[in-house]
């Protein structure tokens, strides 16, 4: 067990060192959701959005939950990129030939992506606070937001790793990534509530796990525990099922890739 933990720690630090060498990429990844979605998009539609429709004090307050989950989405779907590059340059094959627990490779990636995403979410909530958005559920609510984000992120990272192990080139990977990310964002309650969507889009959005994550986080920010506790148990159950299915698919893809 001690050896297993050391393997996970060493591989996780490898991802950290790689990220620290890519300072521009790290900075862009951090500021992109805040700058584009929260600040530009939020302020652009601040006066256009009807507070009666979004049921929030202002549009930035409404949008914050969406930006949090969009950050989880983008990081999760990109979580397999480094594994794909390791596969393409032969490092993954060499790593698998060593006496290392194979699951430590996967777990280290989950740990890295989850940690980076959680830090980003905290920064986003901090910036939102500067715009007057204060989570109605306090610090405990922030912890629950991180938990929901982590649960959603695990499934997304599993999908990303399954793609990384299955596709033949990074070109195919990024094509699928682009195809998945934008529809998931626009067919969710990230930017507008379900009640304001066309009927067909609202029906599709209900099937989107991103919508469930957003609708669990939004009351934690806007209204407080009374409203937040209602969907929380259902969302946790949905996320557990979502994660289980995604992890099963990722495990099968991993076994095929190294088999």
What are these regions (language model features)?
Residues 21-47, 60-75, 118-119, 180-186, ...:
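Hydrophobic alpha-helical transmembrane segments of multi-pass membrane transport/permease proteins
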Residues 51-54, 189-245:
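Membrane-interfacial helix-loop-helix junctions in multi-pass membrane proteins
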Residues 1-32:
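Aromatic- and glycine-rich beta-strand/loop motifs that create alpha-glucan
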Residues 102-178, 227-251:
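Alpha-helical transmembrane segments and their short interhelical loops
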Residues 252-259:
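Short cytosolic juxtamembrane segments of multi-pass membrane proteins
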Residues 19, 75-100:
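Transmembrane helix boundary and interhelical loop/hinge segments in multi-pass membrane proteins
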Residues 55-82, 151-153, 158:
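Hydrophobic alpha-helical transmembrane segments of membrane proteins
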Residues 39-47, 164-211:
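Transmembrane helix segments
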